[in-house]
């Protein structure tokens, strides 16, 4: 159908806004995978010790707070107070977006060797992606920790330690590889949840993706885009 507000085709609008949501979700799941796997491994290696308790406390802290609250706090601290990161949009207002190839600014700027646009797109992307990643952080951390503990108790790990292999080699090459299979499954499942849950984050950071599009369409009572995005999700 056609938008009642912009008189633009809904399919055309979805194609225009989808890359922003996809880029945000990919960055968020990458951050969640890195942070969650690291915390899960540390928790397993230091079971029932300070790093274990600390990592679980940190994860619980960030997961317990609503994303919109964390988003505003991060904007105030890292954006306005410290000035480390921008707090809205995908690029600076006066910056021309890189020529579209994939629609992902970070990828397109690299393909065009536009490193200024790449730096700007990464700095704009970091805060919303970090806030969104907290939604998947707990699941990835828990499943990594559980599978690491299970793998550490396997007979082949005990044998490798008995023959004198370095602990770093045992953990990195054998234990983590075995434990990461289940973690990878959880990461793929969380990707869909993050994409569907990006509405609040996109709205607060004024990120021009599907989440912001459906909020603006709802406020305007523009039913065609609402139905289109609902079908897509």
Over which residues does each language-model region extend?
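Residue-level recognition of oxygen-bearing side chains
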Residues: 9, 73, 90, 139, ...
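Short membrane-interfacial helix/loop motifs at transmembrane-helix boundaries
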Residues: 1-12
């Amino acid at each position: 159908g056609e938008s009642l507000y912009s008189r633009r085709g809904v399919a055309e609008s979805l194609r225009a806004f989808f890359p922003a949501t996809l880029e945000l979700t990919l960055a968020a799941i990458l951050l969640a995978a890195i942070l969650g796997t690291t915390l899960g491994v540390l928790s397993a290696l230091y079971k029932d010790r300070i790093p274990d308790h600390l990592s679980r406390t940190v994860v619980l802290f960030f997961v317990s707070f609503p994303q919109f609250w964390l988003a505003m706090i991060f904007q105030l601290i890292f954006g306005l107070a410290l000035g480390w990161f921008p707090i809205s949009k995908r690029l600076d207002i006066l910056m021309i977006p890189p020529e579209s190839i994939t629609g992902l600014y970070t990828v397109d700027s690299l393909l065009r060797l536009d490193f200024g646009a790449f730096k700007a797109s990464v700095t704009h992307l970091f805060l919303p992606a970090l806030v969104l990643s907290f939604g998947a952080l707990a699941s990835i951390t828990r499943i990594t920790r559980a599978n690491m503990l299970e793998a550490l108790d396997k007979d082949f790990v005990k044998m490798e330690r008995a023959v004198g292999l370095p602990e770093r080699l045992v953990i990195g090459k054998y234990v983590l590889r075995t434990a990461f299979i289940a973690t990878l499954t959880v990461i793929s499942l969380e990707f869909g949840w993050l994409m569907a849950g990006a509405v609040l984050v996109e709205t607060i950071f004024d990120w021009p993706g599907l989440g912001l599009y459906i909020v603006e369409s709802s406020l305007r009572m523009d039913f065609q885009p609402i139905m289109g995005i609902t079908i897509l999700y």
